[in-house]
Amino acid sequence: MPIEGKIGGDFTGWNTSKLNAESSLSYTHDFGRELRQVNLEGEAYFEVTRNEDKPFVVHTKYLDIEVLGTSFNVYSYERENVMEMALISGRIKIQTCSEPSRVVYLKPNEKALFNKESGIITVEKTDNRFETAWLRGDLVFRSTTLSDVLAKLERRYGVNIPFE
């Protein structure tokens, strides 16, 4: 089930953060003084207020996501070959961490898919009801293999489901 965490301290401009199962979010003790940066492993939903002097950046192993005042979802599990970023509202800038660096900007109802093996980012239209279904406790599968369905069920419920 989704976990909504309350984070202490002065986080002006960082309104909401919700973490999905098997996810972690870290930040430095001086968050917000000069920079607003967090590190994410797993899946999280953010609502962030725009601040041009202190951009909000989500770092993952492969991508940096600069928030330009927005709400968005990031799916970045280490075991998965594809990362996904879905924009609910506002605007985000996505930049690869590898060289040569590539940049894409998302508009609402778009999502970026980053293939970790090829390093290719693609952008496509999406229905954000599906992208944020986990926030409501729902699981949605479309054209998904049985092994991927079982992997998500295992993650969600913290169980092992045998499959051959």
Short names for language-model regions:
Residues 1-164:
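A residue-level detector for the "anchor" residue at the start of short, highly conserved motifs
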